[in-house]
């Protein structure tokens, strides 16, 4: 079988010391590895110098906003419960949500949280997932009311590889400066590097566009089948404004900031769907057909994200750059350094 289709072909070893538990401060001082595909050139610089390397292109950002999706409560017996909200079921008659619950629960069990919030376990699903319903003062909560309540009692859902509790600093650090549409349970991390000053400078030379893709917990889901074509990609809600669609439909060069932007642009390029659910899986045998350049962080081994990067530059080249980044002590994952692919 073609090695590009084998899960084991996307593996690498990373020392724990290179996993960033906090962002660089100031954030634009993060390091940036630049790879020019045309000339096969590699540059090591800092993120604040990004504009020095950018060609004439439109820049697309994901303006999703991370909700405080992790809450702690109790069973009626007093046993502790941790719930991680994934997403709403948009087509259900009653407001129902998909959630992951740590702790054994039964169907129809009631769980108790702060601010008189109660949860009824509606259905037990696979992989520790549960279909749940939220109540406050015995009134069913819809998505908007739930998100408002979570803002008061919830915790920022840091990724599983950050081995610490969320802190006050994460409220700002794990949210992009242009985040506005609530619904993500993970940040589009390439966006986290941008400061207001950097954004202002970019606007002077580049057209800036926003789209929304609510990053789901599936972004952390590991690929488990050796033939990656058998992997069932997670689905996430997206919306693209008309003006952004027109740029995608044009021949204007595009820089996508982050893998979520890439998947949204490429889904639209294939389907002409402006709003819906994106489950596009990009890899070397299913490469991008529209986006020209990519800005992204360094991703987990054997993840769909490293496969997406490989779709741009080839699997072997991707692994070589990761090997170089490890040698040069770049910081990895959500709070880590960045890579620009031209």
Curated annotation (Swiss-Prot):
Tell me the route in metabolism or biology where this protein functions.
Answer: tRNA modification; tRNA-queuosine biosynthesis
* Enzyme Commission number(s): 2.4.99.17
Q: Where in the cell is it found?
A: Cytoplasm
Which cysteines does the record link by disulfide bonds? Answer: none
Look at the named UniProt entry and state the broad enzyme category this protein falls under.
Answer: transferase
Output the GO biological process annotations, alphabetical, semicolon-separated: queuosine biosynthetic process; tRNA wobble guanine modification
Q: What is one cellular component GO term in this UniProt entry? A: cytoplasm
Q: Could you tell me which InterPro entries the record lists for this protein?
A: QueA, QueA_dom1, QueA_dom2, QueA_sf
Catalytic activity field: 7-aminomethyl-7-carbaguanosine(34) in tRNA + S-adenosyl-L-methionine = epoxyqueuosine(34) in tRNA + adenine + L-methionine + 2 H(+)
Coiled-coil ranges (or none): none
Can the keyword Lyase be found in this entry's annotation? no
List UniProt keywords, sorted A-Z: Cytoplasm, Queuosine biosynthesis, S-adenosyl-L-methionine, Transferase
**A GO molecular function for this record?**
S-adenosylmethionine:tRNA ribosyltransferase-isomerase activity
Q: Pfam families annotated for this entry?
A: Queuosine_synth
Presence of keyword S-adenosyl-L-methionine: yes
Which HAMAP family would you find in this protein's record?
QueA (MF_00113)
User: What do we know about how this protein assembles, alone or with others?
Assistant: Monomer.
| UniProt record similarity statement | Belongs to the QueA family.
Q: What does this protein do?
A: Transfers and isomerizes the ribose moiety from AdoMet to the 7-aminomethyl group of 7-deazaguanine (preQ1-tRNA) to give epoxyqueuosine (oQ-tRNA).
NCBIfam families linked: PRK00147.1, queA
Note the PANTHER family from the entry.
Answer: S-ADENOSYLMETHIONINE:TRNA RIBOSYLTRANSFERASE-ISOMERASE
- The identity of this protein, by name, is S-adenosylmethionine:tRNA ribosyltransferase-isomerase
């Amino acid at each position: 079988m073609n090695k590009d289709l084998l899960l084991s072909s996307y593996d690498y070893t990373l020392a724990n010391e290179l996993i960033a538990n906090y962002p660089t401060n100031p954030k634009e001082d993060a390091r940036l590895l630049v790879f020019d595909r045309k000339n096969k050139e590699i540059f090591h610089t800092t993120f604040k110098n990004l504009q020095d390397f950018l060609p004439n292109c439109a820049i697309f950002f994901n303006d999703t906003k991370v909700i405080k999706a992790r809450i702690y409560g109790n069973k009626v017996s007093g046993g502790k419960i941790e719930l991680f909200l994934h997403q709403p079921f948009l087509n259900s008659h009653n407001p129902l949500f998909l959630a992951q619950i740590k702790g054994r629960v039964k169907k129809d069990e009631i769980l108790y949280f702060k601010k008189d919030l109660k949860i009824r376990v509606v259905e037990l699903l696979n992989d520790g997932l549960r279909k749940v319903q939220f109540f406050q003062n015995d009134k069913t909560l819809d998505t908007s009311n739930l998100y408002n309540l979570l803002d008061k009692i919830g915790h920022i859902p840091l990724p599983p590889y950050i081995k610490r509790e969320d802190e006050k600093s994460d409220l700002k650090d794990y949210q992009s400066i242009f985040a506005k549409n609530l619904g993500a349970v993970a940040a589009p991390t390439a966006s986290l590097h941008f400061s207001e000053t950097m954004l202002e400078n970019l606007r002077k030379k580049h057209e800036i566009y926003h789209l929304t893709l609510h990053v789901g917990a599936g972004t952390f889901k590991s690929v488990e089948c050796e033939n990656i074509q058998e992997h069932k990609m997670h689905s996430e809600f997206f919306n693209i404004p008309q003006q952004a669609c027109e740029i995608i439909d044009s021949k204007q060069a595009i820089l996508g900031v982050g893998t979520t932007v890439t998947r949204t642009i490429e889904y639209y390029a294939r389907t002409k769907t402006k709003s819906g659910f994106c489950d596009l899986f990009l890899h070397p045998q299913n490469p991008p057909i529209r986006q020209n350049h990519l800005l992204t962080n360094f991703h987990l081994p054997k993840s769909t994200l490293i496969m997406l990067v490989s779709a741009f530059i080839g699997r072997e080249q991707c692994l070589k750059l990761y090997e170089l980044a490890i040698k040069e002590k770049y910081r990895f994952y959500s709070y880590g350094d960045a890579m620009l692919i031209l």
